[in-house]
Amino acid sequence: MTKNIGKITQIISAVVDVKFTNNGELPEILNALECYNDKQRIVLEVAQHIGDDTVRCIAMDSTEGLVRGVEVIDTGSPIRIPVGTETLGRIMNVVGEPIDGKGDIKSSNISSIYKSAPDFTNQSTERNILVTGIKVVDLLAPYTKGGKIGLFGGAGVGKTVLIMELINNVAKAHGGYTVFAGVGERTREGNDLYHEMIDSGVIDLEKPENSKVALVYGQMNEPPGARARVALSGLTIAESFRDMNEGQDVLFFVDNIFRFTQAGSEVSALLGRIPSAVGYQPTLATDMGELQERITSTKNGSITSVQAIYVPADDLTDPAPATSFAHLDATTVLSRQIAELGIYPAVDPLDSNSQVLDPMIVGEEHYSVARQVQQILQTYKSLQDIIAILGMDELSEEDKLTVSRARKIQRFLSQPFHVAEVFTGAEGKFVNLADTIAGFKGLVEGKYDDLPEAAFYMVGTMDEAIEKAKILKG
């Protein structure tokens, strides 16, 4: 079979035009083309057909130094990456090339990054709770095994720290495999995560086959083409683990889905498409749907996905975060107001929600305690204007008691994280679901009305709060 060879005719930033004149055959849309820039392989993805003989492509790598006239070869298929157990313990880029300096990834399984979502008949609808050990999450917005979870928050409120803690609490105790896709985030954070996983034994450098995680990075410094596709590359590896013979329960972490949308917007602008609301690409909902619909559980295995989602200017109605809401089973909203109070994780207990906070799934006691906690916090929120203007003394005795309990609940929702030990000096805590429910049940019933507020701040279980109260009382 003769190779379909073209030549570069135009380069504008990450957009490259290639002319095919040999036999008049144009590569299909989404096909991967290859060219070499000073011995470095560059992959181009076909985005548009222009006229009879030219295709417009998006580069998956920097185009600096690339010149017109360079030969381009059509690979005949979309971007294909190595999948399977050989990827464990390794870091690769969007096109499947290793970037950890440990040689090629020798995998017999190569897969296209574009696939259809599983058939309806194959999808599983079972609902089980995934215990994270984080009180505010487990009580008020519990996660589901095989569900899609979104962590929403503005800049600097703790999305990445929360994702790292979930990796620490869930992935390390988890029997199956984990895939982490770094989409347009800081290279330093990706490096920190890699070394942390080596230190904790999740990645075994001596015997990579014993590792439990595969990493796919397309960080902030990458061109928009790579950032727009790296989530699909990570998902392809997660799907391969899910569909293995014995079936696996796979954890799929993405940091950050907003950067996926942002990169799509950049690509769209480079291709000259007319923007839609707030300057986003007109295909925003389609792009998000194609990614999210593939993240699903089948009868063979499950993919539980945790996605950090940046909220521009703390506006949850921005089209990028708003489009992802529809796809999620649980949303954890991080609030700047709560972070300003020094309460971490800065999860908003009233904005966060979960489809599985249902008495049929979590049980009557859990549901009842969660709703009582939210009711007390909601009452406190509605009283804050009165307190700010008139002061606490003007409240009724009943309201004073509600405010006192709400402030204790607010502080008890804080928790020291394992991954933040180096910054806080406080030992990280993993709290079992039964202890979480029991602690908050006691609080709403007034069992701990005599304990000072400070005793509930940055502790794990209620027993620790009682011990702390004894120390505070001296």
Swiss-Prot record:
| PANTHER family associated with the record | ATP SYNTHASE (PTHR15184), ATP SYNTHASE SUBUNIT BETA, MITOCHONDRIAL (PTHR15184:SF71)
Q: Write out the catalysed reaction.
A: ATP + H2O + 4 H(+)(in) = ADP + phosphate + 5 H(+)(out)
Describe, as the record does, how this protein assembles with itself and its partners. Answer: F-type ATPases have 2 components, CF(1) - the catalytic core - and CF(0) - the membrane proton channel. CF(1) has five subunits: alpha(3), beta(3), gamma(1), delta(1), epsilon(1). CF(0) has three main subunits: a(1), b(2) and c(9-12). The alpha and beta chains form an alternating ring which encloses part of the gamma chain. CF(1) is attached to CF(0) by a central stalk formed by the gamma and epsilon chains, while a peripheral stalk is formed by the delta and b chains.
- Provide GO CC annotations from the record: plasma membrane; proton-transporting ATP synthase complex
Q: What does the UniProt function comment say about this protein?
A: Produces ATP from ADP in the presence of a proton gradient across the membrane. The catalytic sites are hosted primarily by the beta subunits.
One Pfam family cited in the UniProt record for this chain: ATP-synt_VA_C
User: Membrane topology per the record?
Assistant: Peripheral membrane protein
- List the molecular function annotations (GO) for this entry: ATP binding; ATP hydrolysis activity; proton-transporting ATP synthase activity, rotational mechanism
State the protein's name.
ATP synthase subunit beta
Q: Where in the cell is it found?
A: Cell inner membrane
What protein family does this chain belong to?
Answer: Belongs to the ATPase alpha/beta chains family.
Binding-site residues, ATP: 153-160
Biological classification of the source: Bacteria, Pseudomonadati, Pseudomonadota, Alphaproteobacteria, Rickettsiales
Q: What is its EC number?
A: 7.1.2.2
